[in-house]
């Protein structure tokens, strides 16, 4: 078995000589991650370094970070924060749809209120049904 296992690494290293530099690049990657985490820690300590630490973060996540920063720099920046506040005010129902409909069409408010009332009534009916089951179960015992 020693001869077989010994012969395999020799052929493997001869065929794939790039495997060693890959391991080295991983070491540099972990070193880069360590330095990046240190910069994040420093940014948490000082508020001035936060702006400088955000720019490397955008380079690492180009799809998410650049799109969000692009939206923030445009004029619609004023409209999303009020929507977020409205979302927090709405309780459990899907917050995105009511905010859009409330702002666009006042006629749809009545429809939404009716739907919400129906949901509330359905919950009440279920609660009443459960309590009746419980009370009937207690009587039979």
Curated annotation (Swiss-Prot):
Plays a key role in the replacement of histones to protamine in the elongating spermatids of mammals. In condensing spermatids, loaded onto the nucleosomes, where it promotes the recruitment and processing of protamines, which are responsible for histone eviction. A motif (Nuclear localization signal) lies at residues 114-122. Its main location: nucleus. Zn(2+) binds at residues 12, 16, 27, 29, 33. GO terms for molecular function: DNA binding; zinc ion binding. One of its GO terms (biological process) is penetration of zona pellucida. The modification Phosphoserine is found at residue 136. It is found in: Nucleus; Nucleus, Nucleolus; Chromosome. The keyword Magnesium does not apply. Belongs to the nuclear transition protein 2 family. Residues 1-141 are annotated as: Disordered. Keywords: Chromosome, Developmental protein, Differentiation, DNA-binding, Metal-binding, Nucleosome core, Nucleus, Phosphoprotein, Spermatogenesis, Zinc. This is Nuclear transition protein 2. Residues 130-141 have a biased composition (Basic residues). Residues 1-36, 56-77, 91-106 have a biased composition (Polar residues). Residues 37-55 have a biased composition (Low complexity). Testis. One of its GO terms (cellular component) is nucleosome. It comes from Macaca fascicularis (Crab-eating macaque).
